[in-house]
Regions:
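Class I S-adenosyl-L-methionine-dependent methyltransferase catalytic core
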Residues: 1-152
Length: 152
């Protein structure tokens, strides 16, 4: 019997209600709706025309939520190819390919100088079983990835 698809959804904005489907994975814990709602309520006025980086995209829920609420561009990093494919399916379905880039790579090993861009908002929600917060913050700082008023 095939494994059932798990789902999450975009909770507000232009793409509210859009389902994000993915194969269940014991190492994946999508951001819960309540957590997303709280985060995006704080950011409400800070998303319009912003460039965002999702360093550990997983299902893409945070970056896609940002797009739904007015972000100009999102770059997603995800090291699992299947999850990148799932994000790309949603990006295509929403018709926002021109606003997104999905990179199948480990963000903590990527040469960010190749991107030659700064971000207004960086989502940092690494796998729960790995200690990557400090390493990621160091990468953000060393590569000067934030704009002057950027947020992590």
């Amino acid at each position: 019997m095939a494994k059932k698809q798990a789902t999450s959804r975009i909770i507000a904005g232009d793409y509210k209600g859009t389902k994000l489907s993915f194969k269940p994975n014991k190492n994946l814990r999508p951001t819960e709706s309540k957590t997303k709602e709280t985060l995006f309520n704080w950011l409400l006025n800070d998303l319009h025309k912003k460039k965002c980086l999702d360093m550990f995209a997983g299902t893409g829920a945070l970056g896609l939520e940002a797009l739904s609420r007015g972000a100009e561009e999102v770059i997603f990093f995800e090291k699992q190819k299947a999850l990148c494919g799932a994000i790309e399916v949603v990006v295509k379905k929403l018709g926002v390919k021109n606003k997104c880039r999905v990179i199948n790579a480990n963000s903590t090993a990527f040469d960010f100088k190749k991107l030659n861009t700064k971000f207004d908002l960086i989502f940092l929600d690494p796998p729960f079983n790995e200690s990557l917060i400090q390493k990621s913050l160091n990468i953000i700082s060393e590569n000067e990835l934030l704009t002057d008023k950027g947020l992590v």
